[in-house]
Amino acid sequence: MEKNFKRTTVTSALPYANGPVHIGHLAGVYVPADIYVRYLRLKKEDVLFIGGSDEHGVPITIRAKKEGITPQDVVDRYHFLIKKSFEEFGISFDVYSRTSSKTHHELASDFFKKLYEKGEFIEKTSEQYYDEEAHQFLADRYITGECPHCHSEGAYGDQCEKCGTSLSPTDLINPKSAISGSKPVMKETKHWYLPLDKHETWLRQWILEEHKEWRPNVYGQCKSWLDMGLQPRAVSRDLDWGIPVPVEGAEGKVLYVWFDAPIGYISNTKELLPDSWETWWKDPETRLVHFIGKDNIVFHCIVFPAMLKAEGSYILPDNVPSNEFLNLEGDKISTSRNWAVWLHEYLEDFPGKQDVLRYVLTANAPETKDNDFTWKDFQARNNNELVAVYGNFVNRAMVLTQKYFEGKVPAAGELTDYDKETLKEFSDVKAEVEKLLNVFKFRDAQKEAMNLARIGNKYLADTEPWKLAKTDMERVGTILNISLQLVANLAIAFEPFLPFSSERLRQMLNMDSFDWAELGRNDLLPAGHQLNKPELLFEKIEDATIEAQVQKLLDTKKANEEANYKAKPIRANIEFDDFMKLDIRVGTVLECQKVPKADKLLQFKIDDGLETRTIVSGIAQHYKPEELVGKQVCFIANLAPRKLKGIVSEGMILSAENNDGSLAVVMPGREVKPGSEVK
């Protein structure tokens, strides 16, 4: 039986303060969390939305070393950028703090000490990689090498970004230190571990029996971890950036970031509510909901609950809605490759269009499987749905009211059967949207809300009030009254999804406030109520705007390919006599034209110093014919003739293939006589 809670604590995964926020973060965590929180607030429920920056861990220290600054400089830069971006985008945190705060350091230290004093940790000595030149133990991200699975270079000690496989530092082939580049050695070090195996029995019961309603991807991943058998997990590591382990003999060691970061939810709450924070974390009448990405499932469903249970006074999460990953134009989003749409850049490039991105990310939400974001789909959903469906209906209803009734809501006369059917339809939508939001199906809930606008467009198209204006103004008034009630319902239904647009629509409708309980009513706007001047809610996004964004990504892709370029391996040696069999000459291009019905082929007439010969070459996608006329090219003169598209080709023009697949014809550095040999 579902329990009724007095309040809800909602957390969203703490973004890592070593870079900006991108659309993958938004789609996976922050947009769905914000939709849910706004929905609860609209229902007048007691809810707290907790956010903050995760500011400890190896990637931050690596970036600091690369830039020659301190880790604090790094986290200061990105914390404030992330916070500002969230505020501008409308992610409505009640508090957004950081794990480098004094409150967090104190609370995380006290949390560790309580578990330590209760005997909840085990101490173990193990061998870990050590950089003898830098005099430092190497955490996973400080070690790089060849991935044992896909054999790409540059894999980290915890993950290969190329193939996505989770790794241990000792898995790497030819490991090297990311600090000095030297080969690390193994050295003994002592650490504290949380024995997750000790918690396995109750975790299995709690997750697999008591939370079968969790999303299949969450439930399935938890079951997989439990079926493999839980192992002790280190809660400390050898680093100089982080929260010092608060026990004797732990000099040079800090709390592992996975242990420290989730405590940030609690410390951020304490920072906001120093006198009442425990109500939100320890009262059984409080519901705890974590919004995360799939890479955080094990930490929020197994590790953090084990920590809370071991401490003894905290509530456990009631639900952990986790999304899969969002890809970008068919490729995995990668911060290291700059393959992302960054939130702060989007806000600059698309001012006032926060809701467009919120809408598209929700429509494509990776709720049960990885999904893809493309700029063409972004444009299509804006133009064909927000503009053509939602915006079009609102504008028609408002403009017609302005035209026929001076912007005042007309009274409704006698209702037809069709009027009553329409009113019932949008009354039914409330129950469906509510049901979907309650089970975290945000994509379907938004789709259902958009159906309100579709109902409205159909109603106006079917009733055609503009045709009745000369003969039956009472009927026109009834049609527009129903249409305006539907517009008001749209403003309420879309508030969790499109808060900026709903606020603008509220002002146009001249409504004081919204209340979810009123959704579905057909008397939200009384007769005679004065509306404000209508404005367009959304505007079309032109092709040129989208092409600029696509080009930005293409430029990024090209830069990545150039940065990662490696020449192909040299082929097996050949004998000198074999090479001497090739007769490579320089010829002058007399004529050049495209080969009909062949996209890749150009036909050349070449002066080879003795005669004119024909050569067909597959470079039509890289050169225009007129670019090559008069140029000198290198070609193999003694290659056996071969027919291509019915044309006899008497040689092969030499080209160099670039890393991006483009071809560059080999030409002499200065003009020489046609027929000159290449030696």
Curated annotation (Swiss-Prot):
- Residues bound to ATP are 335
State the top-level EC class.
Answer: ligase
The answer on whether this UniProt entry bears the keyword Protein biosynthesis reads yes
Location of the protein in the cell: Cytoplasm
InterPro entries hit by this protein: aa-tRNA-synth_I_CS, Anticodon_Met, Met-tRNA-synth_bsu_C, Met-tRNA_ligase_1, Met-tRNA_synth, Methionyl/Leucyl_tRNA_Synth, MetRS_core, MetRS_Zn
Predominant localisation class: cytoplasm
Which Gene Ontology molecular function entries are recorded, alphabetically?
ATP binding; metal ion binding; methionine-tRNA ligase activity; tRNA binding
Query: What protein is this chain from?
Result: Methionine--tRNA ligase
In which organism is this protein found? Answer: Bacteroides fragilis (strain YCH46)
